[in-house]
Design a protein with these regions (language model features):
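A structural boundary/capping signal
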Residues: 1-157
Length: 157
């Protein structure tokens, strides 16, 4: 586990009831880009004994910007605990961190949140910034300050 991932887990864990953990994920692809939650939920409908998994893709520190990109993400696991991701992804150096509290929060607050996918994050100089992209304009990213890594901050509740 890289230092960036370890730091993120330490910072997020106090806000999550379930333990966060790094998991090994097989990159399968084949589904729609930039649609991870729908891809994961579609797989649940298409396959037996498969469940959606929520969490994060923690990328390595970018030496040019001094930033760490932490992307909120959905993937799947089978009944044996094998994790796999059907969303095409360019982040082959990212570490997958399972955070099932994101799913629980999104499910309980479905009608009050804009998206069932949490805000992605940028970490620099000890500060986390929430980042949202407009899926109609992929290159448009809005940043907002957050006071903690609590679910209500990550989902704009």
């Amino acid at each position: 586990m890289r230092e960036e991932t370890k730091k993120f887990i330490e910072d997020r864990q106090p806000h999550a009831a379930k333990p966060l953990k790094v998991v090994s994920v097989k990159l399968v692809g084949g589904k729609r880009p930039n649609d991870c939650s729908n891809n994961a939920l579609d797989v649940v409908d298409e396959m037996d004994r498969v469940r959606p998994i929520t969490g994060w893709l923690v990328n390595p520190l970018n030496p040019l910007t001094g930033e760490v990109e932490i992307l909120a993400h959905w993937w799947n696991a089978d009944a044996k605990g094998n994790h796999f991701d059907t969303t095409p992804c360019l982040y082959n150096e990212a570490e997958y961190v399972e955070d099932l509290d994101l799913y629980t929060f999104a499910h309980k607050n479905y009608d009050a949140i804009e998206s069932i996918v949490a805000s992605s994050l940028k970490y620099k100089n000890g500060v986390y910034i929430a980042c949202e992209s407009n899926l109609k304009e992929i290159r448009t990213i809005t940043e907002r300050s957050i006071s903690s890594l609590a679910n209500k901050e990550l989902f704009k509740l």
